[in-house]
């Protein structure tokens, strides 16, 4: 009976070690996959945020430019009419 216990114990230990190594490798792969996903999402979010800011600044610039033009036209019209 003792002769069967050693090989059986060895098989069990080797099986536990291989399962442990597989689990560690699987966890490492999952962590790497989540890091890749986070990197992709942060890049996409960064690009979208950048595009949103640029389009917002363009719209603000257009509005400010139009206000300046309107004010200039109003002042020019006032001076032409002599009402200023």
Swiss-Prot record:
Function: Shows antibacterial activity against representative Gram-negative and Gram-positive bacterial species, and hemolytic activity.
Record's keyword annotation contains Disulfide bond: yes
Name of the protein in question: Esculentin-1B
Signal peptide extent: 1-22
CC terms in the record's Gene Ontology section: extracellular region
Pfam families given in the database record: Antimicrobial_2, FSAP_sig_propep
GO biological process: defense response to bacterium; killing of cells of another organism
Tissue: Expressed by the skin glands.
Compartment(s): Secreted
Chief location of this protein within or outside the cell: secreted
Cysteine disulfide links: 78-84
């Amino acid at each position: 009976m003792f002769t069967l216990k050693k090989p059986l114990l060895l098989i069990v230990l080797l099986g536990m070690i291989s399962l442990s190594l597989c689990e560690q490798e699987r966890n490492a792969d999952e962590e790497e996959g989540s890091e890749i996903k986070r990197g992709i999402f942060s890049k996409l979010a960064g690009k979208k945020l950048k595009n949103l800011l640029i389009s917002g600044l363009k719209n603000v610039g257009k509005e400010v430019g139009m206000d300046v033009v309107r004010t200039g036209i109003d002042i020019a019209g006032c001076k032409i009419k002599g009402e200023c």
